[in-house]
C-alpha cells in the first residue's frame, strides 16, 4: 500500500483522524499552498504588516510571540482577524520543554494564553510523554494540534538517532493530539499513519546563515525528503520591499514540488 505521504492533500484530509490536520490539508488544497512563513520580528507593527502581506500565500503563519517587545491583547485579536481574512492557521513556535503540569499552565495561562489563539504549537520530547499529556489536557478540547520536534535544521543539533525514534513512538501513542513533526524528512513508515512534517531551513538562494542554520530547496524538502510544509523566514521578509514577490516565489516552488511528488507516486 502507498504511504499517505505520497497521496494528495485532499485524500489525506478525507481520512485523517486529527481535526487540526484535516483543517490544514483542506486549507492547503483550497489555497494551493504548502508554505509557512516564520515571522521572527520584535515589534507588533512589523509582525502584523508581514502577516498581512504574506497572508494570501501561506497555509500557516509561524510566530515567536515572546520576542515581541510591545505585545498586547490587541496583537492577538488582530492576528486572529488576519487568519480569518487570509485563511491561514497560526502556529506559535513555543517549543515547550518542561514537565506536564508546568507546560499545561504555560500553554493556557500567563501573559500569552497561547492555547486560546494558536491552532498549532510544538514541544520537545526531552521531558518524556508527560509533556504531551499536559498540553493535551488544554489543547484537545479546543481542537488544537501538537507537533513534536523530531529533527532540527541547525548544525550540530542533538535531535537525531534514538531521540528521533522515541519521539515518533510517542507520537504514535498520542495520535489524537499529535498530528506531526518538525523534522527534515518524512516520518510515516506504515500505511495506517499520516504524520504531517513541517520543515524549517528552506531557502532558494543561500545554504547557510553563519549561525549554524542550514538551508535546503523546496524540491529537496518536498520531493526528495517527503516533507509536507516548507517553513521560510528571512528568505521572504529579509528584504521588506520584496515580501509579496518572495512569498509568491516560494509558494509556487513548494506547490510545484508537491505536484511533482504526487505525479511520481500515482498508481
From Swiss-Prot:
GO terms for molecular function: orotate phosphoribosyltransferase activity; orotidine-5'-phosphate decarboxylase activity. Gene3D superfamilies: Aldolase class I. Pathway: Pyrimidine metabolism; UMP biosynthesis via de novo pathway; UMP from orotate: step 2/2. It comes from the Eukaryota. The keyword Ribosomal protein does not apply. PROSITE patterns: OMPDECASE (PS00156). It catalyses: orotidine 5'-phosphate + H(+) = UMP + CO2. Keywords: Decarboxylase, Lyase, Pyrimidine biosynthesis. It is an enzyme of class 4 (lyase). SUPFAM superfamilies: Ribulose-phoshate binding barrel. The active site is at residue 95. Pfam families: OMPdecase. Its EC number is 4.1.1.23. The keyword tRNA-binding does not apply. GO terms for biological process: 'de novo' pyrimidine nucleobase biosynthetic process; 'de novo' UMP biosynthetic process. Substrate binds at residues 40, 62-64, 93-102, 215, 234. Belongs to the OMP decarboxylase family. This is Orotidine 5'-phosphate decarboxylase. It comes from Phycomyces blakesleeanus (strain ATCC 8743b / DSM 1359 / FGSC 10004 / NBRC 33097 / NRRL 1555). The lineage of its organism: Eukaryota, Fungi, Fungi incertae sedis, Mucoromycota, Mucoromycotina. The gene is pyrG.
Amino acid at each position: 500500500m502507498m504511504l499517505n505521504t505520497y497521496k494528495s492533500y485532499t485524500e489525506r484530509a478525507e481520512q485523517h483522524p486529527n481535526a487540526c490536520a484535516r483543517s490544514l490539508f483542506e486549507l492547503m488544497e483550497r489555497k494551493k499552498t504548502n508554505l509557512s512563513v516564520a515571522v521572527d520580528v520584535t515589534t507588533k507593527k512589523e509582525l502584523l504588516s508581514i502577516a498581512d502581506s504574506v497572508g494570501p500565500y501561506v497555509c500557516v503563519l509561524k510566530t515567536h510571540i515572546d520576542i515581541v517587545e510591545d505585545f498586547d491583547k490587541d496583537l492577538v485579536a488582530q492576528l486572529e482577524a488576519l487568519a480569518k481574512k487570509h485563511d491561514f492557521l497560526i502556529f506559535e513556535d513555543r517549543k515547550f520543554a518542561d514537565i506536564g503540569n508546568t507546560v499545561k499552565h504555560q500553554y493556557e495561562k500567563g501573559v500569552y494564553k497561547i492555547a486560546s489563539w494558536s491552532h498549532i504549537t510544538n514541544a520537545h520530547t526531552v521531558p518524556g510523554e508527560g509533556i504531551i499529556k499536559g498540553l493535551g489536557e488544554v489543547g484537545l478540547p479546543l481542537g488544537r494540534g501538537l507537533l513534536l520536534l523530531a529533527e532540527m535544521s541547525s548544525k550540530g543539533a542533538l535531535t537525531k538517532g534514538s531521540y528521533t525514534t522515541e519521539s515518533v513512538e510517542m507520537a504514535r501513542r498520542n495520535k489524537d493530539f499529535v498530528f506531526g513533526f518538525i523534522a527534515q524528512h518524512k516520518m510515516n513508515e506504515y500505511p495506517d499513519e499520516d504524520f504531517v512534517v513541517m520543515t524549517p531551513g528552506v531557502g532558494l538562494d543561500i545554504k547557510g546563515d553563519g549561525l549554524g542554520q542550514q538551508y535546503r530547496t523546496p524540491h529537496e524538502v518536498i520531493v526528495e525528503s517527503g516533507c509536507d510544509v516548507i517553513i521560510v523566514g528571512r528568505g521572504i521578509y529579509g528584504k521588506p520591499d520584496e515580501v509579496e514577490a518572495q512569498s509568491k516565489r516560494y509558494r509556487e516552488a513548494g506547490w510545484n514540488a508537491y505536484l511533482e511528488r504526487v505525479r511520481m507516486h500515482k498508481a
